[in-house]
């Protein structure tokens, strides 16, 4: 049975047979059966499900999923409807308001971005409840590095958005100069004032897309 159901399957199915992934899968089986793990196992690959490879225009790279109840659903920075906005997402929405005048919505459900070609990818796709970074170094990084490499190999330009040191370490994988890389400090309250605020990523992305003759992203998240 195919895990992925769009063009990502063509380039990533081989990963699922590799020794590192077989080991990761066994680890996850054990974790999901003995611990509370986020997101739901049915949501792990949502970033890839919502944003096919051929349709990805922008990549916003996150670290690992939110580790509180009902938050994570497989898209970086996004939370399920009805869940309070985490501080980093509050700051993303503040910058969006300053940049493009978009009102801050009553939810942090970023699916509308993903459906327009914004790949909301975490570098680690699972986490234990209440334990940030608990699934780092278990194999996910090899898998998501392959995702980034597939995008790097693509003819059509991609805009990579790398917020914070962790995301910027992945710059080494982006070797093709047809792509665009936007960097800024992480939107976390600990670093947002060091240059995330005022970086205007959303208007910059839309300007690049316009120059390429691509449709721009409608960034405003509707209230629910």
From Swiss-Prot:
Reaction equations catalysed: Hydrolyzes single-stranded DNA or mismatched double-stranded DNA and polynucleotides, releasing free uracil
Annotated EC: 3.2.2.27
Gene Ontology molecular-function annotations: uracil DNA N-glycosylase activity
GO terms under cellular component: cytoplasm
Active site: 64 (proton acceptor)
Keywords of this entry: Cytoplasm, DNA damage, DNA repair, Hydrolase
UniProt entry tagged with the keyword Ion transport: no
Pfam families: UDG
GO BP terms in the entry: base-excision repair, AP site formation via deaminated base removal
Source superkingdom: Bacteria
Coiled coil: none
Subcellular location: Cytoplasm
Task of the protein: Excises uracil residues from the DNA which can arise as a result of misincorporation of dUMP residues by DNA polymerase or due to deamination of cytosine.
UniProt record similarity statement: Belongs to the uracil-DNA glycosylase (UDG) superfamily. UNG family.
Protein name: Uracil-DNA glycosylase
Protein species of origin: Halalkalibacterium halodurans (strain ATCC BAA-125 / DSM 18197 / FERM 7344 / JCM 9153 / C-125) (Bacillus halodurans)
Phylogenetic lineage: Bacteria, Bacillati, Bacillota, Bacilli, Bacillales
